[in-house]
Amino acid sequence: MKIKELWNKIRKGVKAGMAAVTESNVLTDNRVVSMIEKFKASGKYKLMQEGERYYQVDNDIKNRKITRKVDGHKEEETWRANNKLAHAKYKIQVDEKIAYLLTKPVTYKTDGADKNDTYVEKVKDVLGKHFQYQLTQLGYEASNKGIGWLHVYLDPKGKLKTIMIPAEQCIPYWSDRSHTELDAMIRVYNTTVWQYNQEKEITNVEIWTKDGVKYYRLEGQMLVYDNDKSMDAGGPVAHYKSVEEWETWGKVPFIPFKNNQIEMPDIKFVKSLIDGYDLGRSEAANYMDEVKNLIFVLKGYGGQNLSDFIKQLNEDRAILIDDTEDGGVDTLTPQMDITALREHYEQLNRDIVESGQSVNKDLDKFGSAPSGVALKFMYSSLDLKCKLMETEFSRGFEMLLYFVDLYLQISGQGDYEKIDVGLVFNKDMAINETEQIQNCSNSQGIVSDETLIAHHPFVSDVEEELKALKEQKAAEGPAWDTAPPVKDDGNGCLLYTSDAADDL
């Protein structure tokens, strides 16, 4: 075989292989339906639902039924005490985390290429004044569901807007195993419509790619193409409309804001411990409520079934005795080990704090007014957890800037693609204010004024404070930094002018 023939065969083989790979990445209707079913049945989807439920304190203990086996089958004992004490420990941990990382306004940090902060101001203007609130929303979403999704679009006026899409509606189709770039996004959500005066629920499916979007309805196991939404004036719709033509962003307009690198919600790490805490406290409450905690010594009782006796006693608070002379009921009271029970609760509580990386509020160790070092130790686990989210959110903001830069270009506001802007998360930690102010005072001349202001306990918005200081210095400048005009009286003496005297 000649070399040329061999080379042609190799080229054909490579082309066939590339075609096979391309074909394997095509999202056909059957593949989309399969991906939807697989996602809805996955452990990740279940965790999203659990995270949302437990944040609303709808814990599993609320579904508890007390049963016993009767003649080989389970029977619910509705007459027994069944306290369902659901504790809000998970909600407290999530609120604590978001309040620590995302409630204080973020600071936009740029390199020296952005003169007069022109680019930063345009970024802030495009994202809008509510972007901080949107970051907080994404923080809750990522904490409860492992990931939050921000969708980028243009409104009817041509302004760039962003909206958070619930994570349980989004099925990402990643282009790589590290989940850094999307090939497509499948969004599934239900809407209610009226048909002949009856409500009907429709499952909508959107398939977003780098080239545009297609709309479907899911009916059973089949995708039905929605031509009205997918086509406009005879042509397919894309990401946004520029004048009269549809355009694309060049990327899938969905941005991930992850809770951590593995996209796991916080409930994953504490659910079993919280369930144990709920169960233990509920059992203790049942013990205090139920008559079963007394051991009954029956004399002359005519019934044969002890279950009927307990049931009758709980419902009627009385029993019938056949032998009126020698019959009766004596009771023995078992002792409850309160000390062991308390130790169990306290250990579970410590385990929840440790596994959930929450603030250690043990005042026995740190006292009622802990120092700065003690406070840092108390917040160390929470700070570690928040740093993981901070890294992922910084990456998400970097992806968002791609769309902001492109929007600034197409709207004729300039090309800022080569300028880097990052987010600085200003954490809100309880501090010893007196100690912090003293440290800031001692650091003057060693670090920049901006750093000192960022760490001063009285400052809530660093950028606003810097702007206020600049305006204050400009207003005070002529009074303290300008020498008053003088004139010679002819005898070699210098006199202040009248204008200068008036200023003194």
Predicted regions and their residues:
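Extended, helix-rich architectural segments
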Residues: 1-173, 180, 485
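Surface-exposed loop-to-helix/strand elements on domain peripheries
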Residues: 112-117, 121, 300-303, 318-435
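Extended, regular secondary-structure scaffolds
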Residues: 149-254
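Extended, charged amphipathic alpha-helical segments
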Residues: 234-370, 374
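Long amphipathic alpha-helical coiled-coil segments
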Residues: 401-417, 448-465
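C-terminal structured domain segments
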Residues: 429-451
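Long, highly charged low-complexity segments enriched in Glu/Asp and Lys/Arg with interspersed Ser/Thr
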Residues: 456-484
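Conserved small/polar residues in nucleotide/adenosyl-binding loops
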Residues: 496-504
